[in-house]
Amino acid sequence: MQIGNFNTDKKVFIIAELSANHAGSLEMALKSIKAAKKAGADAIKIQTYTPDSLTLNSDKEDFIIKGGLWDKRKLYELYESAKTPYEWHSQIFETAQNEGILCFSSPFAKEDVEFLKRFDPIAYKIASFEANDENFVRLIAKEKKPTIVSTGIATEEELFKICEIFKEEKNPDLVFLKCTSTYPTAIEDMNLKGIVSLKEKFNVEVGLSDHSFGFLAPVMAVALGARVIEKHFMLDKSIESEDSKFSLDFDEFKAMVDAVRQAESALGDGKLDLDEKVLKNRVFARSLYASKDIKKGEMFSEENVKSVRPSFGLHPKFYQELLGKKASKDIKFGDALKQGDFQ
């Protein structure tokens, strides 16, 4: 899949999710973009919304978070605190372009999509909490841009519906990210095999949106077929934000990128042919050698022929065929046996 100038068929697409890790500072946001590029990220992703894009400014119990990292916080207040203001976007997209890192966003309502159009984004991201809103999904599909969908809380029925909508809107560029919508995510709750299931069941590009500590999960995800990795990024450990508890700092993110690149390199092309480097070591494979002096006319037997390393003699597959045949010449102990040595 082509996302901007990036081809996911050739390389795993690594996204640094900024989210709330600007900690309310535009300067921090711009520094984070530059740092993400240096850490090896292919793209920086932001979130485009106002609190009104997401919820109602209500004090009713329905709108108070219960449990988890944001326990007892009011939804409206949480989103007000975590948002990336509209007025920052121009500088964010400009900085990303200047730094040579791709930039796109997760919108959450029609007005967010309309606002983002002015930046001609390379892609859109749909958060899993919006994946059940068919009208919103269709709005994004109509944009005809590559679209990445986190599947965290989405049901199979909803995911099939998303595929149907994108097909109807003639938008083939759809990515499903395996995602566990708990913050942070315990490693035993990751269910990474779901990456394989998403690929097989929905026939779309797949990846991982990771909220766990460390970067074991992204590396494993690549081995399971992930072509997109999204991980929350922060400038350093001094950042305190709504997402900092499950984010990687510069050094950690760089280490993750290096590990992911090593993992995809280690996967290879799946072909079973021996490459040139391995073929050189074929010299240490077994072959047939004289384990004793053998006189001309003497029969080959288990007593005077042995399959040993290295491989300059006959292939061991000729061992049984050779037994009982007569030597056509004198053969010394340690001589490699050849086709012309028997009659």
Swiss-Prot record:
InterPro entries linked: AFP_Neu5c_C (IPR006190), AFP_Neu5c_C_sf (IPR036732), Aldolase_TIM (IPR013785), Neu5Ac_N (IPR013132), Nonulosonic_Acid_Synth (IPR051690), Pseudaminic_synth_PseI (IPR020030), SAF (IPR013974)
Keyword Transferase appears in the UniProt entry: yes
Function in brief: Catalyzes the fifth step in the biosynthesis of pseudaminic acid, a sialic-acid-like sugar that is used to modify flagellin. Catalyzes the condensation of phosphoenolpyruvate with 2,4-diacetamido-2,4,6-trideoxy-beta-l-altropyranose, forming pseudaminic acid.
EC number: 2.5.1.97
One MF annotation (Gene Ontology) recorded for this entry: N-acylneuraminate-9-phosphate synthase activity
Highest taxon of the lineage: Bacteria
Domain AFP-like: 287-343
This protein's name: Pseudaminic acid synthase
PANTHER family per UniProt: N-ACETYLNEURAMINATE SYNTHASE, PSEUDAMINIC ACID SYNTHASE
CDD domains: SAF_NeuB_like (cd11615)
Family (UniProt): Belongs to the pseudaminic acid synthase family.
Pfam families on file: NeuB, SAF
pH dependence of activity: Optimum pH is 7.0.
SMART domains reported in the protein's UniProt record: SAF
Catalyzed reactions: 2,4-diacetamido-2,4,6-trideoxy-beta-L-altrose + phosphoenolpyruvate + H2O = pseudaminate + phosphate
